[in-house]
Amino acid sequence: MPPGTKGDPSNVTQPLPCLPSAEEDAIKVFVRIRPPVEGTLTGVDGEQGLCLTALSSTTIRLHSKPEPKMFTFDHVANVDTNQESVFSSVAKNIVESCMNGYNGTIFAYGQTGSGKTFTMLGPSESDNFTHNLRGVIPRSFEYLFFLINREKEKAGEGKSFLCKCSFIEIYNEQIFDLLDSASAGLFLREHIKKGVFVVGAVEQVVTSAAEAYQVLSMGWRNRRVASTSMNRESSRSHAVFTVTIESMEKTNDLVNIRSSQLNLVDLAGSERQKDTQTEGVRLKEAGSINRSLSCLGQVITALVDVANGRQRHICYRDSKLTFLLRDSLGGNAKTFYIANVHPGSKCFGETLSTLQFAQRAKLIKNKAVVNEDTQGNVSQLQAEVKKLKEQLSQLLSGQMPGDISVARVPSVGDNNMDYMNNFIEAMMILEKSDREKKVLLQKVVQLEDLCNKKEKFIQSNKMIVKFREDHISRLEKAHKEGRISLSNNEQDDFIAELKEEIRTLKEQVEHHPRVAKYALENHSLREENKRLHSLQSVKRAQEVTAQMIAELEKAFLEVSVSEKDRQVAPMHSTPIQLDNNSLMSAARMRERMLQLESELATSKQEYEEFKELTKKKQVEQESELQSLIKSNQHLENILEAIKANKRHEVSQLNRMHAAETIKNMTTPTKSYNLRSRLVPRLSPDAMPNGLMDTPKSGDVMDDIINEPIPPEMSEQAYEAIAEELRIVQEQVTALQAKLDEEEGKNIRLQQQVNKLELCSTQIQELFNSERSNWNKEQQDLIAQIKSLEKQKQENKSQEDVLKSEVHDLRVVLQSADRELGAVKGEYSLYREKQEKELSQLSARHMDVQLQLDNVRLEHETLLEEKRSLQDAFDNLEEVMKFEIDQLKQEISDSKHENETLRAEFSNLLELLETEKERRQKLTSQLEEDKENKTKELLQVVDENMHLRKQCSELMTKCEQQVTELHGLEHSLTSSKEMIADLEKKNTADKEVVADLMNQIQVHRTTIIHKTESIDLLTRELEDIHSKYSIVLLAKEESKTVIEEQEKQIEELRECLERKQSADNIEKELLCDDLAHATEELEKLTEAFNKQEALLHTHEKELVEKEQQISELTNQVKLMTDLEISREQEKIRPASSNSSSPVVLPETPRTPEGNPYDSEIANLQKRNTNLEILVSELNEERTSKNEEIIRLKMQLCETENMRLEIQNLQGMCKELKSQLENCNNVMKDSNDQKPSDMQDLKREIEKEVSERMEKGKATEHILKLQAELEETRNILCTKDHSLNELSKEIERTRSLEAKAFTEKEEIRSILEGKYEETEKLSHELDMLRKQVLFLAEENGKILGHQNPNQKIQYLVKLKKENNKLLEEAEKLRIENLFLKESKKCEHCN
């Protein structure tokens, strides 16, 4: 279904931009709006004809009531979007990903008649696969085979492709093969590797786009299509066209196979029976279509719930469509939805459901994976597996794959521990970095504050300079004007300026950078103090001390309680009374006391050390604090001095300004007097006389003084003043800088002196306090020693008592053994009973669990049904609101139109009466002037013709009004019926919802009762388990005490045997590895020499080929520019010839090549050969690197072995000591096992000798390591050269990819131009038809040239006019009758 009608062209030619994706595998949605059919209302932004508008390229607005709804998608295509832009936005990326091994799917979804088939295939014509308006599927074929040919050209014979096509349809939930017209209903099956597939579907191999077109057209003829009231060719089934792409790439002996599927799906549109008016078979088809689409919607909602973290069952198997496309919905595929919507207001409900469906689908995320398989001979595959395992082990151990550093290789058992350690270290580093980041951010804020203060300081300096310059300029102006004394206003202004300058100086002092710097240092010192207090060692020491104090207090309480009990108890107790005071408890208490004493001593030492450290740090910090306080006070004094100095400077400046003004006023006169005195000296005769007479001649002096000062002299004076000022300012600044430096030095020295003084005083205080503390501690220790001696004597007396008690306890133990045997028998009987009860309870528990699961499933199904009903109810409610509003608008419009029509009808009646009168007058005039005024008769006849036309128009209008009135009455009755039906449905839905709510409440109550019963059962089970565990613990404790000594001896023997066997195996493996390493070193050196020669030759060839490539690329660019200019010149004359029929060139299904394609192909082949050579070299390099890594791993293993040997030697020593202890124990217990211990000693000595031999082997391996390092350095240089070659190859690849993208852009632009020309040709045809029709009409009008023919024509018109008048009168009478009947109805 095309936009507009089937086959109508679109209007926009600009390509759409590629869609941005937030996540790579999320389902993307493209919304396309179908243009409205010609003749329908096409209002703008919510007028009567449209129910939605596209606001931008990603947002769409639905005109729902009471407020419009906004939807956002990946892209929204408006009415004027063309087919090429849809393909470039939707299918291009999917086809490219299919070439890379990913599965891809494109869906077209929407209501019937919304343009799905037009979007996917194109217009419904025979040549739709070569038409300029062809759809997404034909364009995908062209692009796919173009990419395949490009890959074949690049890879040569090393890569091959196989494409297979299948075309099926799902009709009434049955699968049919469209490529086999005789096929019956097919079945779906599931395979582990293939996934879901159709059994027996024909798969045809295709090698070009033309063959794929043939397959598609052959299947399309068999597809079920029928006409409905909404669409002339409506799809009655879901069509799925699948292209399977298999690529096979051979590299050496390995074969890499990639397979992918491209599913192009044209879904049948959702239908409503009242809109399509289907019956019989068509109604059944619509039901099955709607059922499968509702299943698709349920699957999508379930997938959205799963993505949000809810556990849901996804019902793929409820529909054949969802089961077949399972991977495309939340599986292994990249999916694109094209949602086609109709903008008409009649399709509001379906448009809303389509947009909601697309919005839900946008939330689904697929997990696309490259479908790849590798085949080859066993040796190659084993090498590949080995390489991958090594990379995996390096990644697990925290190394990069390319890192060739010697590191310890962890064993398989230690991998998890290493991973955990690495993880913990990483988390610690992260926390540390976060803390450092916070500290640095605080510092940055402080530095920014300091910078702001410096800027303010600079601004204040500028303001001061500005004030001074203004003052100087004002004084100069006053001097020029000749007035020295200032007025009151000027004095006030001057005072205000001085006050402003003082204020700026104060701000300068406040924002002085030194003050800010000292504040920053103070803040950092406080932070350091906090950090020292929050150190882990300090906290740990405090925790340890607190724990020790608590333990000591607990022990003291226990001892005091036991002493009280002993005092109360009699001295000689019977064995039954002394059951609680056993010998074991006494031994434990002794051990505990010893442990506590040792821990107390260590904790005291740690506490003292920590105390000393903290005291030292506290002293340092206090001294620093005191020095900072003093420095702060000193700075405050400096600030006060600066303020006073500034005030003094201001007063001095005022005086200087006054003095300078006086100087400026006086200096010009003086200089002028001097000049006038020197004038007489110019004449030699009057020189002595002039010198003598100048003071005497007063009149002459007055004349000179009264003369005006020349401007040159005043300028010289001003320049001299300015230079003096500048020199003074420079001197002041230099002195200020020196003063600042001296002040800084003074402050630092003062701080150091203060620090030293404080340190000395605090150290003296500490020394005195520590001396007093030591004296107190010494006295306390003496008192403790005395108390401990007393306790020792008491303990000796207690030991004597306990020895006597031991004998009694042994007798008690024998009786306890007898009792234990009886208890064991009772326990076995009790255990059997408990097991029976447990089995019964477990069976009951399983039954209850099954019932619970059933109830949960029922609850979930009810919730799903409720949700679906609620969604349907909401949609119906919105549709009802929208339709009611539309009907109200239509009724109001029809009323308004009726009123206008009535007014027009009355006007027309009046006109008719006037026309009648006029006609009567004209007829009388005609009878009187028949013979004399033929010309006037002709004019009257013309007017009569005009009146006839008006009458005919009035008649047609009346007829239309009558029909419209009938239609409005019918629409009113139908709308009333619809409202009644909707109200009934609403009430029915409310009743259903109420029933469902009641059922849910009943189920909830049953669930609550069942949960309570389950809780009771679980409590009973827990009680039984606790009793059972208590009994088991008692039994295990009794067993462990008996079996521990036997296990220790057996474990020692087994450990020794294991270590001996492991050492022998390791020794043999090391010898084999050494021999293998020497052989591989020799092979590596030979291969290395060969590689050097090969590299030199390849470098020369690469330089030559780069020159050739640069020359050819320049030629290709020139040729492409020429071709583009030629094509533009061809297009221009084609567009200018509007009168001639437009002959469009057939669009190439695959892009055509230019004359230099062969040269580019040769270059590409050379490039591929170079790539193959480089890949071979890289493989050899990687294999050698692997060998080096393996050798280094062996070296690491040997080092580890050496370390283990050392550890084992230490263990052996420990074992010797343990064995000596064991010997002593065994001599006491058994005198029959000395031979076994001697054998163990001999075995240990053998192990030590073997370890020594292994040490010698490690030395030999270290020598090999040095040789390997030399070879590694040589290989690094070769790697560098290889990297340069690979960079060059990457550069050529990027240039080729750039050229390809440019070519594709030009092709898409050309496609758009072709579509535009098609549209223009269609418009030309329409205009030609209109011109022909107008020419015919004009010929009819101009045909009556004879006056007799005109008179006959007028007579005919007169007769027709009379008939029309009669009919008009009849219609008027009928209209009056209708009005009266309506009035009667209203009265009734």
Curated annotation (Swiss-Prot):
Changing L1371K: Inhibits its targeting to microtubule minus ends. GO terms for molecular function: ATP binding; microtubule binding; plus-end-directed microtubule motor activity. Residues 1139-1388 are annotated as: Necessary for its targeting to microtubule minus ends. InterPro entries: HMMR_C (IPR031794), KIF15/KIN-12 (IPR044986), Kinesin_motor_CS (IPR019821), Kinesin_motor_dom (IPR001752), Kinesin_motor_dom_sf (IPR036961), P-loop_NTPase (IPR027417). It comes from the Eukaryota. Keywords: ATP-binding, Coiled coil, Cytoplasm, Cytoskeleton, Microtubule, Motor protein, Nucleotide-binding. GO terms for biological process: centrosome separation; microtubule-based movement; mitotic spindle assembly. Strongly expressed in testis and weakly in lung (at protein level). Residues 26-364 form the Kinesin motor domain. Residues 369-1383 form a coiled coil. ATP binds at G110, Q111, T112, G113, S114, G115, K116, T117. Plus-end directed kinesin-like motor enzyme involved in mitotic spindle assembly. Required for centrosome separation and maintenance of spindle bipolarity during mitosis. This is Kinesin-like protein KIF15-A. It comes from Xenopus laevis (African clawed frog).
